[in-house]
Design a protein with these regions (language model features):
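Basic, alpha-helical interaction scaffolds
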Residues: 39-115, 133-134, 167-183
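Long, amphipathic alpha-helical regulatory blocks in the mid-to-C-terminal portion
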Residues: 127-137
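Short, conserved micro-motifs composed of acidic
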Residues: 3-6, 10-49
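Extended C-terminal regions of large enzymes
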Residues: 121, 136-203
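Short amphipathic alpha-helical coiled-coil/interface segments
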Residues: 118-129
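Mobile genetic element proteins and their domesticated derivatives, centered on retroelements
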Residues: 1-5, 19, 55, 75, ...
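Short aromatic/hydrophobic-glycine micro-motifs
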Residues: 9-10, 56, 134, 155
């Protein structure tokens, strides 16, 4: 609602609105639009359409894989710009960690992504580096992700960043004394015991 949006910052824009028909929690294939006046009509929201809320693609449910696909394209695009630039190696790694990776890390706390997809993105990252002379094809990939203090290059792995984010989230929920968060903890533990998705089993 217009009043409820003020605390979030965005302004109410009727041109970006759609009508969504839901019956018993299921989106209906209803093409009825809402006519506000003679010159303005709010169109019905199609089943295959998507919208962004706080930068995350959604439909009637979270589109985790679609969000990962879009974010990974932007991540690799930024990496290509960084590693084809005349920056020094140290600055390229810093830019990769602080400018490119946040495209994905912003979404990690709320998304559920397969490890195989994240490993593929890490391989694409190394491919970009090789193509731009930032890494020798035969050089150890493990050294790439070690800190510079111990002989590595300090690059952050997407897979590792995702795991760290999920572990921190699980620890925060598990150690919280907030009554509301305890309800989340109990629900997650119950889900884990039944073999369903949970913050404790997502890895």
């Amino acid at each position: 609602m217009p009043g409820g949006q003020r605390c979030l910052g965005p302004r109410w824009n009727p041109k970006k609105c759609s009508v969504l028909h839901v019956k018993r929690g299921v989106q209906q294939e209803d093409n009825d639009s809402i006519k506000l006046d003679e010159s303005f009509v709010i169109q019905s929201f199609k089943q295959q359409s998507h919208y962004k809320f706080l930068g995350v693609l959604e439909n009637t449910k979270q589109e985790d894989l679609l969000a990962l696909e879009c974010a990974s394209k932007e991540y690799l695009k930024r990496l290509s710009v960084i590693w084809s630039s005349p920056l020094s190696d140290v600055n390229k790694v810093t830019a990769s960690n602080q400018y490119a990776l946040p495209v994905l890390s912003y979404l990690m706390p709320t998304q559920r992504w397969p490890m195989s997809k994240l490993q593929r993105i890490d391989r694409e990252v190394r491919k970009v580096m090789v193509e731009n002379g930032g890494k020798h094809p035969a050089r150890s990939s493990a050294l790439l992700y070690l800190p510079r203090a111990v002989g590595g290059r300090g690059m952050k792995s997407v897979e590792t960043a995702y795991k760290v984010t999920k572990i921190k989230t699980a620890l925060k929920i598990h150690g919280s004394t907030d009554p509301t968060v305890k309800l989340v903890k109990n629900w997650d533990e119950n889900s884990a015991s039944k073999g369903r998705h949970s913050v404790y089993t997502i890895l």
